[in-house]
A protein has these predicted regions:
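Conserved P-loop NTPase-based nucleic-acid remodeling module centered on helicase motor cores
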Residues: 1-58, 263-266, 270-274
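Accessory N-terminal region flanking or inserted into the helicase ATPase core
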Residues: 36-129, 138-143, 156, 166
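Short amphipathic alpha-helical segments that mediate assembly, nucleic-acid/protein binding
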Residues: 23-24, 42, 51-54, 68-75, ...
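Core RecA-like ATPase module of SF1/SF2 helicases and allied nucleic-acid translocases
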Residues: 6, 193-196, 240, 246-437
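Conserved helicase motor core of SF1/SF2 NTP-dependent helicases
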Residues: 4-7, 127, 134-221, 227, ...
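Short, surface-exposed amphipathic charged segments that create phosphate/polyanion-binding patches used
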Residues: 12-22, 197-202, 282-290
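Amphipathic alpha-helical "lid/sensor" segments that cap RecA-like P-loop NTPase cores
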Residues: 52-71, 238-258
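Flexible, charged surface loops at secondary-structure boundaries
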Residues: 121-125, 231-237, 396, 430-431
Length: 443
């Protein structure tokens, strides 16, 4: 199993994938201005160059098989407000020339698929399985069409009620209209009865959809309305908290305080799949605790520790030496670590809060203390996940809380295209395995 672009990349032997550094060098040669100024010496800012609206629209135009002008007009106003048509066309034309003359040639995801469609030979495969077909854009469908000509059996799976990427070019009707035998899997193994009732009420409001029967599990489940995320019983259990936009998860200044609430209370969480307390941070702390209690750790554990100790506590050159040491399982004691691996002896008596004060910020140190006092597990997967609805697609949890707020752009879009919003909340609500909490909108 692989993504469509990964398949095309492998089959076509493509080696160079578009990255922020490529865009930086392109801008240095052509002197274009994007929608904002980026710090060219910052790794994260460099990567965000690829996500600038100009390059997003250019990539989406390829994915949706449209001109950049058509794509710009199909893009939500908030994303294209700083994009000028003349500049867009100039950048698109110059970028295509630049990427093709580069050695090796630079490929975006859409370029990889286009390369296979125009030049590739379908491999000899007997069965083709296409999943999440309701989210495929036109270019992906052209890839499916090409592969299907030489394949004996094709399975295309999807649910048009969960087509939440139409704004980005997905064509669920292509999936619904695809010729062949239709098999409806009408039994849910996730959704309990009370959650199913809410989901059905939403799906029936979708005007353009394939009618289908969909039965819930035997369990009743629960549906609860609350006026604030602070009233959610987040102290225990597995949770998935969903919102339409990312700022609704983290912008406390606008009254959206779920992230702050979790931090203040010491509840372990991930935000759009990124852990608030990374694995490496806990591995370093555990190695420090083990070294001070047991007196010995492995070289691998020492590497975890050195990742966070930094130069203040390790002599010059030894961090790289330890990280490159191939004998990860070798046991070393305190004295060996001081004599042979460069640990500064004076730091051994310090508590973890002191020794990691330069590498773990004060907010996270306070959070870790609260979480440990709560007897929370900071090693395993965080029991609370906060996410946008689009990021959580495919996920599930025993307890799901859905913030019912809409952004101004969504409110405006809902007037003309209500189906997209109905599908979005259908997806959100059907993540619940047992208990659904609906958090009333602030707006």
């Amino acid at each position: 199993f692989c993504t469509s672009h990964a398949f095309c990349k492998r089959v076509m032997g493509i080696g160079r994938v578009m990255c922020g550094e490529d865009v930086k060098e392109f801008l240095e040669e052509y002197s274009f201005n994007l929608t904002k100024n980026y710090k060219m010496d910052n790794r994260r800012s460099l990567q965000s160059l690829v996500e600038d609206p100009y390059f997003q629209i250019i990539e989406n135009a390829k994915t949706n098989c449209r001109s950049v002008d058509e794509e710009r007009l199909s893009t939500i106003l908030a994303l294209r407000k700083n994009v000028t048509p003349l500049m867009l066309n100039s950048i698109a034309e110059a970028w295509e020339e630049y990427r093709l003359k580069s050695v090796p040639v630079i490929y975006s995801f859409a370029d990889m698929i286009n390369k296979f469609i125009t030049e590739g030979t379908p491999p000899l495969i007997k069965v083709l399985i296409v999943d999440e077909a309701q989210d495929l854009a036109e270019l992906n469908w052209q890839l499916v069409d090409k592969l299907s000509k030489t394949v004996e059996t094709i399975y295309i799976a999807g649910d048009d009620d969960q087509a939440i990427y139409e704004w980005n070019g997905a064509k669920p009707q292509r999936f619904v209209d695809y010729a062949g035998e239709k098999i409806i899997l009408n039994q849910s193994f996730r959704i309990p009865k009370k959650v199913h009732t809410i989901a059905e009420n939403i799906s029936k409001r979708i005007k353009v959809r394939e009618e289908k029967e969909y039965k819930p599990r035997e369990e009743e489940g629960t549906v609860t309305e609350v006026s604030s995320v602070n009233l959610l019983p987040l102290k225990e259990g597995e949770w998935l908290v969903l919102a339409s936009c990312d700022y609704m998860l983290s912008d406390a200044a606008k009254g959206y305080g779920i992230r702050k609430f979790l931090i203040d209370n010491g509840f372990p969480f991930s935000h759009n799949h990124y852990r608030y307390i990374p694995h490496k941070m806990m591995s370093a702390m555990n190695a420090w605790e083990k070294l001070n209690i047991e007196g010995t750790i492995t070289v691998g554990e020492l590497g975890d520790l050195y990742n966070y100790l930094g130069k203040a506590h390790v002599k010059r050159g030894f961090i790289t030496k330890v990280l490159n040491d191939e004998n990860k399982g070798q046991q070393v004691n305190k004295q060996q670590i001081i004599d042979m691996y460069g640990l500064k002896e004076e730091c051994l008596d310090e508590e973890w809060k002191e020794v990691f004060s330069k590498t773990i910020d004060i907010q996270r140190r306070a959070f870790i203390e609260k979480a440990l006092a709560n007897k929370e597990d900071l090693i395993g997967e965080p029991r609370v996940s906060i996410s946008t609805i689009h990021q959580a697609k495919g996920g599930e949890a025993e307890n799901v809380a859905v913030l019912l707020d809409l952004s101004p752009a969504q409110q405006e879009d809902f007037i003309l295209k209500p189906d997209g919003l109905h599908r979005q909340f259908y997806v959100a609500i059907t993540r619940a395995l047992q208990n659904l909490y609906l958090v009333k909108a602030k707006n």
